[in-house]
């Protein structure tokens, strides 16, 4: 309700996360809603952060260990230092941008691994952020047969052995040695393992994967939930 300052910017909520100050962030079709700790919701227009009139529908919101905010959606990835202050230092990573290119504009998941490396899952495979160059490194990953790949990557996490698990749509689940992947040259990287309908999965549309304390990996598929 536009008459109520405590209402949401839009009823379609794609992502919610809590930052270190206990503020609640909501990514919506019309921008960002911020619920400050013990305060009312605050509407933050994207233009206030970027200084442009371009929009984005946010699917994944994240604040990394260095204090940077990362908001990804249907129109690329925003990086900025503070959404409501006077200094934003916003950078917009998008396909075709000469200064800040990205493999795909659709961002599904933003993840920081155990060594504080930042990864994103996109509809153009996965990318790792290089804090030195401030650019993203793109990785193409395939299974050992060349049948499946990590295009349409939906989710990422790192296990206790240093392997990245990558959930995809139509490609199954990929398990890769993170350090070998980072040391690989440009081109296709063959995953250490791939889960598909041929070896345990009930489907190939994987929305999310999550490890538990017992070492199981829970897999959220379209209309079903399994663990491996």
Provide a role label for each language-model segment.
Residues 1-228:
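Carboxylate-rich, polar loop motifs that coordinate divalent cations or form catalytic acidic clusters
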């Amino acid at each position: 309700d536009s008459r109520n300052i405590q209402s949401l910017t839009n009823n379609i909520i794609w992502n919610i996360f809590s930052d270190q100050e206990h503020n609640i962030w909501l990514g919506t079709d019309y921008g960002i809603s911020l619920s400050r700790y013990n305060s009312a919701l605050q509407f933050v227009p994207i233009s206030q952060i970027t200084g442009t009139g371009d929009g984005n529908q946010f699917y994944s919101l994240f604040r990394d260990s260095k204090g940077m905010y990362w908001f990804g959606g249907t129109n690329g990835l925003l990086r900025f230092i503070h959404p409501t202050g006077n200094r934003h230092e916003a950078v917009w990573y998008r396909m075709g941008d000469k200064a800040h290119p990205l493999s795909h504009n659709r961002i599904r998941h933003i993840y920081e691994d155990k060594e504080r490396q930042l990864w994103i899952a996109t509809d153009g495979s996965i990318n790792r952020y290089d804090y030195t160059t401030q650019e993203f490194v793109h990785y193409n990953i395939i299974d050992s047969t060349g049948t499946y790949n990590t295009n349409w990557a939906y989710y990422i996490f790192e296990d206790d052995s240093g392997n990245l698990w990558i959930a995809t749509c139509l490609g199954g689940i990929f398990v890769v040695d993170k350090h070998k992947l980072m040391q690989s040259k440009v081109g296709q990287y063959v995953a250490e393992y791939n889960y598909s309908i041929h070896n345990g999965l009930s489907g190939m549309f994987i929305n999310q994967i999550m490890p538990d304390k017992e070492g199981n990996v829970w897999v959220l598929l379209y209309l079903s939930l399994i663990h491996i």
